Structure formats: C-alpha cells, structure tokens
Swiss-Prot record:
Any Pfam family the entry gives: BacA
EC main group: hydrolase
EC code(s) of this entry: 3.6.1.27
UniProt name for this protein: Undecaprenyl-diphosphatase
Membrane topology of this protein: Multi-pass membrane protein
A GO biological process held by the record: cell wall organization
TM region positions: 15-37, 41-61, 85-105, 109-129, 144-164, 183-203, 218-238, 244-264
C-alpha cells in the first residue's frame, strides 16, 4: 500500500471512530498493525491526525465555540468565562493524569492485546450504564453545572487506556450523572476539543524530531480525510442518538475484542 493511501485509510478510521464510543485509538492501533505501519512515528501520527477530527467538531459547533468568546449577557450559560471554566473542569483530570502517565501509556498500552481488553472493558461499562438508563436532570449545554463538568472529567480519565474510548467514557459518564442522551453526546464532542488539542500538541512537541518536511503530504492527506469523515460521523451520530441506545456499540466491541486477541495472541 502506498504511503498516501495508508494515510488516507488511517485518516478515515480516525474520523469515523473518534467521536463514537468504539475507541479511535484502538482502531488506529489495530489498523496500523494490519497495514504494517507501527512504531513511535506511527503512534505520533495517529495522535496528530486527531486534529482533523477536532476541527470538524469546531466547524459543526462553531456557534457554541463562538459563544465562548462572548463575555456579555444574553449568550446562554455555556458561554464566556463560565463556558471556559466548565471545559477546564472537564479537561483537568485527564490532562494531569495523562502528563504523569504519558511515557507508561506509550510504552506499555499501545498494542493490540491491551486494546482488546480495553474494548471489552468499555463494552461492559456501556452495558452497565444502559441498564440504568439516561437521566433527566440536565437537558442542554446551558444546564451543565460545575459538578457535572468535573464528574465527566473524572470519567474521561478512563480513556487514557487506549481502546477504552474517550467518547464512551464521557458520554456514559454524563448519563450516569443525570444527562439526557443528546446532551451527553454534544458535551462529549465539545469538551473533547481542548483535551485533544492539548494531547495532540504535547505529543507533537515530544515527537517532533521523528518527522521531516517530506512527511507533509502524508500528514495533509491524513488530516483532510480525518476532517471529512469525522464531520459525517458526528452529523449521523447526533441524528441517531435520541432514537437508539448505545448497546449496539457495546456488542460490536465485545465481538471485536476476542478477534483481536486471537489474531495477536
């Protein structure tokens, strides 16, 4: 497979899975092994192409992000300094824990076998939360409280285990804490932006020496495909989120996990 086609495939996998509760990192690791694109450079590329998916969310929720820069009244409660405060509360736990465990995660958890166990663990987590059902206390982004934002941030720490899924951790955590399904999904998407920007920037800073100007076309293809596929995935997911449960994602994960274990054990 040519280098640019490899970049396109990885960008497609990243975009389609980043905001679904199936783990984009897990799928990228598995896909990378299938394409024989592995190692430190591949791992950093898999993190870097998250930027395309991040920008897709910023584009889709541009009004919400614009409200964060409006500091007067009349823009809703999820705006201005209060909006930034809520996002900071959600981002802080995983940011701090991620900085402390970055080297350990890259060295010990970026592999198909550990991803398979994370896929299974995340599936059981989804099924357990679905058994409880959605809450009714929080319905829109303007209803998000500091306690809810921090609680979701604590659940987000589960996603530091590659394969668990940041979306699964935050969406199901929000449901446990009393959110409606649509709010859980939308806040998960919006709150992903600062933490993913931070994680991508930090990883690129740590790994910049691995790349050269010759890699720019490879990166560009991955980022563009990631952006387009994430845009489509988020649009479709939001359309369905109020109509279906998250159980199908759990069954998919439970089906995929043993296949990965059998293939790589």
């Amino acid at each position: 497979m040519t280098d640019l086609l490899t970049a396109a495939v990885l960008g497609l996998v990243e975009g389609l899975t980043e905001f679904l509760p199936v783990s984009s990192t897990g799928h990228l690791i598995i896909t990378g092994y299938l394409l024989e694109y592995t190692g430190p450079k591949a791992e950093s590329f898999q993190v870097a192409i998250q930027l395309g998916a991040i920008l897709a969310v910023v584009f889709l929720y541009k009004e919400r992000f614009a409200a964060l820069f409006r500091f007067g009244t009349g823009h809703g409660r999820f705006s201005g300094l209060r909006g930034w405060y809520l996002l900071a509360l959600t981002s802080a736990p995983a940011s701090v824990l991620g900085l402390l465990t970055h080297s350990f995660i890259k060295e010990h958890l970026f592999g198909p076998v550990t991803v398979a166990w994370a896929l299974a663990a995340g599936a059981l987590y989804i099924l357990a939360v679905e058994h409880k059902g959605e809450g009714t206390r929080y319905e829109t982004l303007d209803d998000v409280s500091p306690a809810l934002a921090l609680g979701i941030g604590m659940f987000q720490c589960l996603a530091l285990w590659p394969g668990f899924s940041r979306s699964a951790a935050t969406i199901m955590g929000a449901l446990l804490l009393g959110s409606r399904r649509r709010l859980a999904a939308e806040y998960s998407f919006v709150a992903a932006v600062p933490i993913m920007f931070a994680a991508t920037g930090y990883d690129m800073y740590k790994s910049y020496s691995l790349f050269s100007p010759a890699d720019i076309p490879f990166w560009a293809v991955g980022l563009l495909v990631s952006f387009a596929s994430a845009w489509a995935a988020v649009k479709g997911f939001i359309h369905l989120v109020g109509r279906v449960t998250f159980r199908p994602f759990a069954w998919y994960r439970l089906a995929l996990a043993p296949v990965v274990l059998l293939f790589w054990s």
